[in-house]
Amino acid sequence: RHWETLDSGSNASLYKLLQLNGGRLLVLGFGGTLLSSDDQGASWQPLSVPARAGLYGAAQLVDGSLLLGGHGGVLLHSEDGRSFELWQLPGRKNAWLSVAEAAPGQLVLSGNGGLLALSLAELKEQKQ
C-alpha cells in the first residue's frame, strides 16, 4: 500500500473534510481554518471566513449553497463556496459539530447542546 501525507499549508488541527459537487474539496479546522482544493488535495488554498471559531460541521445543501457549523454557535453560509456570511441564531452559543439537510430546505444541527431542527428559511430570517 502507498500512503501519502498531503501538505495543507496549515498547522491548524483539521476536523472535517467535505467533497463538493464537481469534486472540489474543503477542509475545516481550528480557529476558523477553511481550505479549498481543486486538484484532489495536491494543493490547498485558504479561504477567508468572518469568524475565528473552530469549524466542525459542513454540508452542501440541495440548492448548492454551503452551511458550516462551528464553536460558539457560529454558522457560516456561502452561495458560491468562496465567500462566507456569518449567521448566528439568537441565544445559541453551543458548538455545532454536524450540519445536515434532512429534506430540501430542512436542516438538522447537532452539537454540545443537542439537536436542533429548523428550516433554511427560518435560519435566514433569524441570522444576526
Map each language-model feature to its residues.
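Residue-level hotspots at or immediately adjacent to binding/recognition sites across diverse folds
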Residues: R1-Q128
